[in-house]
From Swiss-Prot:
Cofactor note: Binds 1 [4Fe-4S] cluster per subunit.
Binding site for [4Fe-4S] cluster: C109, C229, C319
Protein name: Quinolinate synthase
Uppermost EC category: transferase
This protein's encoding gene: nadA
Organism: Geobacillus kaustophilus (strain HTA426)
Record's function text: Catalyzes the condensation of iminoaspartate with dihydroxyacetone phosphate to form quinolinate.
Reaction it catalyzes: iminosuccinate + dihydroxyacetone phosphate = quinolinate + phosphate + 2 H2O + H(+)
Known pathway: Cofactor biosynthesis; NAD(+) biosynthesis; quinolinate from iminoaspartate: step 1/1
Coiled coil: none
Keywords for this protein: 4Fe-4S, Cytoplasm, Iron, Iron-sulfur, Metal-binding, Pyridine nucleotide biosynthesis, Transferase
Amino acid sequence: MNVLEQLKRLDEMPKRYKTMERSELEARARAVKERFGRRLFIPGHHYQKDEVIQFADATGDSLQLAQLAAKNSEAEYIVFCGVHFMAETADILTSDDQTVILPDLRAGCSMADMADIFQVERAWAALIERFGETIVPLVYVNSTAAIKAFVGRHGGATVTSSNAKKMMAWAFSRNERIFFLPDQHLGRNTAYALGIRLDEMAVWDPHEETLQGADDLDKVKVILWKGHCSVHENFTVRQIEHIRRMKPGIHVIVHPECSWEVVQQADYAGSTKYIIETIRNAPPGTQWAIGTEMNLVNRLKHEHPDKEIVSLNPYMCPCLTMNRIDLPHFVWALESLEQGAIVNRITVPKDIAAEAKEALDRMLSLA
């Protein structure tokens, strides 16, 4: 099977859904939700389109939604409006009699895909050879189940953008060094906030299979995987300088997946939840430039008309893979359930799920 045939198989939605009017699609979605009742749970990530998020039973970040799905024992079916690694995490945390569905299998995550399990295993072998048994692996929840399992197997834990600082401190209490993947920016920003100097960090390039950015490897405390979020890496210091010239007194708030330089220049930096709460609690009339995904920025702008809210990058596109989950695919997944056909089920092999859960549980035990 060639690549084009494989891509075609990833999107088997009947063409009729693509030509339906939005009003008909919305009516169909509401009807299925009503008929299924509590047997159906729809988590929606903050970065989802409004056309989809309106049907979410809960909105939040990836781990929060997976935990809510696991607690919702009445739900037989979980139609996850997010991306692939999020649905995987939901499958890991839910029971065997719950079914997790992703409306469009093409909804992946470029950052999660930057850490391939074979590359990670080769990197680990090289790092252990160089540094010995002095390393604790930490993995951002924005990662594949296979990488979470690897970290769980080697005594490490997952982290979120909210608890990365706490988890990094935990890892340092266990050993001398940290191997942080797949997002170098979250790792660098978190380590720096803990007092680790930039010259005490090195970047592992999985293609060159080399450590970069450190003159003295013996002083390295944090090894960062060379990965990034394609959305957040597009925010720049120049954009911050420009918005401050145009709007003196504006507050700049960014996600820690942005580069270190951007985070240092911003007024505030924190997780998606932190950004939402900061905007919600800000005084009326204040001005905000937000460095995160455009769907969320637009939603915050709509929800808080008493504040002036703009994107730090006015030319930013929404997360392309998040946007794969659209109303036609969503309705197709729901109506297929009604017809007794489960499309795009996400199932993590039991051995991988068990080790990935170890990494998740280590983090959750410290929450």
